[in-house]
């Protein structure tokens, strides 16, 4: 198991290319199950979760070939079972449930794993699929689903679940008749999935709004599709510029998809400007101010940026409250930031952050993907040396993060623990 050793206190200057989006690529790759022809994906990030997804697709009968940042999937003899040894490492693997039911009328999927950040129930997925005609049993840790043929239905989500929206959107493309999904997730990654499905021949309207309408079609074909850039990686690098007092140009950077993050970072003192159509420059005016942050479904402030902006707030002037409304137990980075000298007090789903003059390097342990990123950011700003342990979480969601940061001045070494 590796760790990162970070020598802090170096302003970052230069250009960083934003990778393709992990959170868009995972469901889009799973949607390969729906297609009857080969598909070529470009701008695919080389991440542990992507490699796991490709292994899972191969087991399900959709072998995937990785070449650089291009993945070609060739559907052949589909099989209905997603085994535990792959699913246990990645919660997104439950997204094969809807496509398998739509194509085969059956699915046997192990209960998912992934980051340990509280309850992420799949009940919303199952309840909605039942309305389309599926039945489910829990058998030795596996979800066993069956249906004769999925039928279009009118489905209202109690909460705009991203995974539930994606699963039902995929299932509905091959269902009989029209499916109306209400109170759906509006995240850009959901829109990217819908655009991909449309490119394969699906009939979808309303993606990006709270109501999506899907008219089922008999089959989906193949296409070539470019995965959107990763807005969370881009936001993380924006914070890296601010927390080190640096000057970064982020190339192929999403902007509209990051409006809530950019607005909050500007309010804290960062200068964020577009350069051309797809590049963004990030600096700051020398004075960081703490601000209140509340996570919300898109277009609100994303929960996946909560830990990173908290790291920035630890060295800002004043105090701010970070409120987490999406996931429970998503403050596991707080004790580690406190080890580095941060002043953070927890109270239920909120954290009071009071800025300190400096952070001090220390050994810290990553507990989930975004917590890992916050500790790397804190290490970049800290005085002295920081050891971030258990970085396998980081490798699930950030492509070569230490190489990208070192290229703009950071001093980070990967080594065995």
From Swiss-Prot:
Pathway connected to this protein:
Cell wall biogenesis; peptidoglycan biosynthesis
* 2-(S-cysteinyl)pyruvic acid O-phosphothioketal sites (modified residues): 115
Which SUPFAM superfamilies does the record associate with it?
Answer: EPT/RTPC-like (SSF55205)
Entry annotation: catalytic residues: 115 (proton donor)
Annotated phosphoenolpyruvate binding lies at: 22-23
Pfam families to which the protein is assigned, alphabetical: EPSP_synthase
Query: What is this protein's function per UniProt?
Result: Cell wall formation. Adds enolpyruvyl to UDP-N-acetylglucosamine.
- Protein name, UniProt field: UDP-N-acetylglucosamine 1-carboxyvinyltransferase
Can you name the source organism? Nitratidesulfovibrio vulgaris (strain DSM 19637 / Miyazaki F)
